[in-house]
């Protein structure tokens, strides 16, 4: 069987060693004679899974004791509602939302249902895309919190700058970049990330939040989105997707075995450089983002026309390079290079790009 590499934006590929472990556990998890999908979420073995996930997140991101960690059901999009409902209690409360692209804007649109929103555009379009430095963000003095998305999967942009806003609650959607590079958690009040890119399979969102941050909750906040209630119930306010959480636990152990976040960050830089170098040396492939704002996780590039774009997708699939089609909003090609993507996979894509340009350029 030839090597297959999944460059999809999420759900992403999983490490082979994790897939093999899942296969072994599928019918008899921890000598219980049942699958992990059948086990009670109150079972002592599964309670240990939850504890391990939290401890491994703390270890990998150096999370201090000033923060709590909860596991939420569903994707990050639900938190576009949950965040304003847990931080504001009426429409007169103001929140700053940074428009970094598709997801940053979508979060702002959802928040408007619960509070006043000040949308701050930070994307600059000249010859290429760039992002305003944080010191030039027009933050409101009286806003309750600031929300932004450090990595935009659709636009292929990233913000690597660390926030330094005084007396401001800083909230960040790290869904597509969590655990891919070191971050200073202490510079944030709330970090949340869905699991289907760098943490496991879809169905879970991890949230790290500063203790006592939720002091102004909307009285209409559903209990299932009330972060304090979820924390007090050990993330078990209702039955969780046990299999999803189990897989996330395996992926976190795998990342620790790889050497942690610093080591995987170096690998991610190598992978992305293999692709960006080809783009930058080529007159055939185009990327419209300045280097310092390019995402390591989601590489966007364009071919000269739609016909070549479609041919690239067809032939790449035949060669075991899957799910490279760009998002419908921007088109082109998107190569998502999450933690589980190997250097071997990145090299295979790079070699295919060279071949395709030589053959059709």
UniProtKB/Swiss-Prot annotation:
HAMAP family to which the protein is assigned, alphabetical: SerC_aminotrans_5 (MF_00160)
Cellular compartment(s): Cytoplasm
Task: Read off the PROSITE patterns from this record.
Answer: AA_TRANSFER_CLASS_5 (PS00595)
Q: Does the keyword Cytoplasm apply?
A: yes
Give the enzyme class: transferase
Q: What is this protein called?
A: Phosphoserine aminotransferase
Residues annotated to bind L-glutamate: 9, 42
Q: In which pathway does it act?
A: Amino-acid biosynthesis; L-serine biosynthesis; L-serine from 3-phospho-D-glycerate: step 2/3; Cofactor biosynthesis; pyridoxine 5'-phosphate biosynthesis; pyridoxine 5'-phosphate from D-erythrose 4-phosphate: step 3/5
Provide the residue positions that the database annotates as binding pyridoxal 5'-phosphate.
76-77, 103, 153, 173, 196, 238-239
Q: How is the cofactor bound?
A: Binds 1 pyridoxal phosphate per subunit.
Function of this protein?
A: Catalyzes the reversible conversion of 3-phosphohydroxypyruvate to phosphoserine and of 3-hydroxy-2-oxo-4-phosphonooxybutanoate to phosphohydroxythreonine.
Q: Give the primary localization class.
A: cytoplasm
Which Pfam family, any one, appears in the UniProt record? Aminotran_5
Keyword Amino-acid biosynthesis in record: yes
List the InterPro entries hit by this protein, alphabetically: Aminotrans_V_dom, Aminotrans_V_PyrdxlP_BS, Pser_aminoTfrase, PyrdxlP-dep_Trfase, PyrdxlP-dep_Trfase_major, PyrdxlP-dep_Trfase_small
Positions bearing N6-(pyridoxal phosphate)lysine: 197
Return one GO MF term. pyridoxal phosphate binding
What does the record give as cofactor?
A: pyridoxal 5'-phosphate
């Amino acid at each position: 069987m030839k090597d297959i590499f999944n460059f999809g934006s999420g759900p992403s590929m999983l490490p082979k060693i994790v897939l093999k472990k899942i296969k072994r556990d599928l019918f008899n998890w921890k000598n219980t004679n049942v699958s992990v999908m059948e086990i009670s979420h109150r079972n002592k073995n599964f309670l240990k899974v939850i504890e391990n996930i939290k401890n491994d997140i703390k270890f990998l991101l150096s999370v201090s004791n000033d923060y709590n960690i909860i596991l939420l059901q569903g994707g990050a999009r639900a938190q576009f509602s949950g965040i304003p409902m847990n931080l504001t209690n009426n429409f007169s409360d103001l929140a700053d939302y940074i428009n970094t692209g598709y997801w940053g804007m979508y979060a702002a649109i959802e928040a408007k249902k619960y509070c006043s929103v000040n949308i701050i555009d930070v994307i600059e379009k000249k010859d290429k895309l760039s992002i305003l430095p944080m010191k030039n963000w027009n933050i409101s003095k009286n806003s309750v919190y600031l929300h932004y998305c450090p990595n935009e999967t659709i636009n292929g942009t990233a913000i690597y700058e660390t926030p330094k806003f005084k007396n401001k609650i800083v909230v960040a959607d790290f869904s597509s970049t969590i655990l891919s590079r070191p971050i200073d958690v202490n510079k944030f009040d709330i970090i949340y990330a869905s699991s289907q890119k760098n943490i496991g399979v879809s169905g879970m969102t991890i949230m790290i939040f500063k203790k006592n941050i939720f002091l102004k909750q909307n009285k209409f906040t559903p209990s299932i989105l009330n972060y304090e209630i979820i924390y007090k119930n050990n993330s078990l306010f209702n039955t969780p997707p046990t299999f999803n959480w189990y897989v996330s636990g395996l992926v976190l152990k795998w990342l620790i075995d790889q050497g942690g976040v610093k080591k995987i960050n170096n690998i991610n830089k190598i992978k992305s450089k293999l692709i960006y170098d080809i783009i930058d040396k080529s007159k055939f492939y185009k990327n419209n983002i300045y280097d310092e704002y390019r995402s390591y996780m989601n590489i966007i590039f364009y071919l000269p026309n739609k016909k070549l774009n479609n041919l690239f997708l067809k032939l790449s699939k035949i060669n075991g390079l899957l799910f490279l089609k760009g998002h419908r909003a921007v088109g082109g090609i998107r190569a998502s290079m999450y933690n589980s993507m190997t250097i071997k996979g990145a090299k295979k894509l790079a070699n295919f790009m060279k071949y395709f340009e030589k053959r059709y350029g």
